[in-house]
Amino acid sequence: MTEQYHRWHSPNLNLDLEMLVFGDRGFPVILFPTTKGRYHQNKDFGLIDCVKWFVDEGLVKIYCPDTIDDLSWYNKGIHPADRARNYSWYDKMLVEELAPWAMHETGVNKVAVAGCSFGGYHAANFAFKHPEMVSHLFTMGGAFDIKMFTDGFYNDDIFYNNPVDFLPGSNKPELWQMNIILGTSEHDMCKDYNIRMSNILNEKNMNHWLDIRPFAKHDWPIWKEMFPHYLSTIK
């Protein structure tokens, strides 16, 4: 399995970002880390190894970028407005830098996005905000309501980065063309977030699969079962 390391200066964030890329061809998949995880986390915890076959067969090319959790939602040392503004710049980086990069390299005009736990938030927020750029959304143990990080403060930056708030009123036609899988499990602490998101999608008649696995907890073993299954749905 080929692996490449990239470091670049993001003009949208005005800081350096790092990323690992696995594979040399195939459908582009942007895979986000969990809470405060770095670009190498999904490799370190075995999530990349569990989909090695898809990479080796040239079916997918997986992009594992850094996030800015410490500069945005998890930074209690700055005002919630600053947390939200920083995250809006991160979203702009995805739109203007990373997603076009992945599409250009693979020759595909959309990306798949995925993530476990808080990585599921990153994936869902990007997919639902920019469905014109996303064909597949795979979340595993995701949570989708960012208001728990805003100390009661609320503004437009929070609204437009909170899927449970902006999605009900969005009518972008590409939303109904997306392949959406919400993966959770019986003992997942984020199960209720997934049920709530599924209800929102049902109210909008958006086709999706709410995959609730029995017995499992909010942890890597069940996510490593889910991820190859979900990648197999990419056509």
Model region roles, listed by residue range:
Residues 1-235:
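Non-catalytic cap/lid and distal C-terminal segments of serine-dependent acyl enzymes
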